[in-house]
Amino acid sequence: MELIVKEESKTDYNYGSDPYNRDIKTLLNTGLVVIDKPSGPTSHEVAAWVRNMLNLVKAGHGGTLDPKVTGALPVALGNTTKCVPIWHIPPKEYVCLMHLHDDAELVDIENIFKEFTGRIHQRPPLKAAVKRSLRIRKIYEIEILEIDGRDILFRTKCQSGTYLRKLVDDMGEALGTSAHMQELRRTISGPFYENEAVYLQDLLDAYIFWKEDGNEEELRKIVKPLEYGLQHLKKIIIKDSAVDAVCHGATLYSSGISKIEKGLGTDEVVLIETLKGEAVAVGKPLMNTKDMLKTEEGEVVEITRVIMEPGIYPRIWKKRNKNDKSKPELKKK
């Protein structure tokens, strides 16, 4: 990541904090955990167990896995639930065991796998909790790892919302043998990886260790700040004076920017951060990095989702009358 300075600015440490230095209670309400989901429970049940385990008001998972499916299941804690839709932007990766119902030649299997790379059409299965309309999904990568008789182990990286069970059914039909999904494990879920996932028991042990012995070390290894789950987004760093206005949903103006990540385009989601590295909001850039650096005034990012609660940073903008349609203004010092 390369940040380009638009205007040097300092931050006031009387407000906000470094995300990785938050006290443990704040971290539990603005953090996330990546659970290694076991076979059996639903994703909703796992999220509910985490919520109850950590004595939280709310928690939500970042991508449904069927009960029998295992692997990386990110769980948002407390106020981090508002970040869940952002986790669906990057691709997801799975390792799948596919069983053919008849014998097939290796060359035919390889050709079918190539055929199902790229844009595919899918209709959600009957049990899906969404409307069964035809949709387009992208298979970025699909690789055969091992073939043992009629069993095919493969890895695939695909767009969020792809139904792997349906993919296997469709490939089996195209192959002429029919097939079904025997096992499935998610290895990557957006910005989260299988090797950082923990068992539910590990989370419980770490929480009890903190509550009973006051030792936060193990819990801090497992619970990450919400910013950890947004590291895949390009960034704009804003001045302290602009933070509270953005927290109230105001459009970001050029005058509020301190630094911009190189290569930012208008076709992506951008993360707006404080000078301390705290996530403030995400939005749609109205111009690219080059134009943002040149412009001295005007709107540069349309806010689509506010993450930080208002009031953490001081308000340095004029409150408008409800009938006033003009733009918010910074208070003159």
Swiss-Prot record:
Molecular-function GO terms, alphabetical: RNA binding; tRNA pseudouridine(55) synthase activity
- Catalytic activity of the protein: uridine(55) in tRNA = pseudouridine(55) in tRNA
Q: What does this protein do?
A: Could be responsible for synthesis of pseudouridine from uracil-55 in the psi GC loop of transfer RNAs.
Q: What family does the Swiss-Prot or TrEMBL record give for this protein? A: Belongs to the pseudouridine synthase TruB family. Type 2 subfamily.
Pfam families linked to this entry: DKCLD, PUA, TruB_C_2, TruB_N
Where do the catalytic residues lie? Answer: D66
Any transmembrane segments, and where?
none
PROSITE patterns with a match to the protein in the record: PUA (PS50890)
PUA domain location is 233-308
Q: What is this protein called?
A: Probable tRNA pseudouridine synthase B
